[in-house]
A protein has these predicted regions:
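Conserved S-adenosyl-L-methionine
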Residues: 293-303
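Conserved beta-strand signature within the Rossmann-like core of class I S-adenosyl-L-methionine
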Residues: 179-195
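Rossmann-like AdoMet
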Residues: 1-80, 86-132, 140, 150-151, ...
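A short glycine-rich, Lys/Arg-flanked "PGG" loop and its adjoining helix->strand segment in the class I
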Residues: 169-182
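Core SAM-dependent methyltransferase catalytic element
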Residues: 304-314
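Substrate-binding/catalytic lobe of Class I Rossmann-like enzymes that use SAM or dcSAM, i.e.
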Residues: 200-291
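A short His-aromatic
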Residues: 164-165
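A conserved beta-strand element that flanks and buttresses the S-adenosyl-L-methionine
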Residues: 157-158
Length: 314
């Protein structure tokens, strides 16, 4: 049995998907919801050409022992927000356990399929685990993640450029609010490299992943075009946004379920899709500081394109 509790039901997700599509939006969570999307995501992660996943994973692998040394033997709850399939988390969980830390793992995600993988991976490694299906940026779900009086010290993980999938300035503050004195946050971000950053998204491998939720509702490659764009976010120097949208080249109908319900996109209409923020290093650290966090450790990937920081309340 794989223990997963749900604050967010599949029916709620289905209703939210239809509402978002009507508003011509396809939020981040739906790129990991459909079975086809999950399959495309796992294929993307398993291909070494997807450098962003590999940068984050290798940085965790290289730093896991050092990071684990920040925690004394004893109980520790590892709360992973946007855990996905949990494979990067598991590297750190094992390093903590090897140092005598009694880890309990609480992965949080909106994807039932990926959450099951995260929990199963931890259980197979002998680590206590309980999944929570939730949207951690919903205020009610965020409140439910607050520590109880009996909750042991916590390490909160927000890795894989997860802050960048939302508004990182707001998300960093929301996540920081979960920390008590003595709790720590491990977060990372992709560092901006101009055209090379955009090329990391606008390529056949990533396009397959981006197309997956559209394919799941009957929209095909010939129905329109995926467009990737980059712009600066002027709230901070060195804060950059990679966005994408689908532009219909002809009238298309998206299938909203087995009952024949469809939603039409007219030729020329746009469907806004998920985005990803990138940073210069000083801007990423400034965002953490603005959320009331003090960085205690930082590391970068071998190619200097990913920055990871361990921080606590200032």
């Amino acid at each position: 049995m794989i223990p997963v509790q749900a604050l967010l039901t599949e029916n709620e997700l289905a209703d939210e998907f239809v509402s978002a599509f009507r508003a011509r939006r396809l939020p981040e969570k739906f790129f990991y919801w459909f079975p086809l999307s999950v399959r495309a995501w796992l294929a993307l992660c398993s291909d070494g050409a997807y450098r962003n996943f590999e940068r984050s994973r290798s940085l965790i692998a290289r730093s896991a022992g050092e990071l684990a040394g920040s925690f004394p033997p004893g109980p520790l709850e590892v709360l992973s927000l946007g855990a996905g399939q949990g494979d990067k988390d598991l590297i750190l969980l094992r390093a903590l356990a090897q140092r005598g830390v009694r880890v309990s793992y609480l992965p949080v995600d909106t994807s039932q399929a990926l959450l099951e993988m995260a929990v199963r991976g931890a259980l197979d490694a002998g680590i206590a685990a309980q999944g929570l299906k939730a949207d951690f940026l919903r205020p009610d779900h965020l409140a439910a993640l607050a520590a109880e009086p009996e909750t042991p010290p916590r390490l909160v993980l927000v890795i894989g450029n997860t802050l960048g999938a939302f508004d990182p300035v707001i998300a960093a503050c929301d996540v920081a609010a979960l920390l008590r004195p003595g709790d720590l946050l491990l977060a990372d971000g992709e560092l901006y490299a101009g055209d090379a950053t955009l090329a990391g998204y606008d390529n056949p491998l990533n396009r397959r992943f981006a197309w997956a939720p559209l394919h799941a509702v009957g929209i095909r490659d010939g129905d329109g075009e995926l467009v990737f764009e980059t712009r600066d976010d002027h709230r901070f120097p060195g804060l950059h946004l990679i966005s994408k949208h689908f532009r219909a080249d002809r009238d298309v109908e998206a299938l909203m379920g087995g009952g024949g319900e469809t939603l039409r996109l007219a030729a020329g209409e746009r469907l806004a899709m998920s985005h990803s923020y990138k940073y210069v290093a000083s801007t990423f650290l400034r965002i953490l500081a603005g959320a009331g966090l003090a960085v205690r450790w930082q590391g970068t990937s071998d190619d200097g394109r990913f920055l990871m920081a361990l921080a606590g309340r200032a």
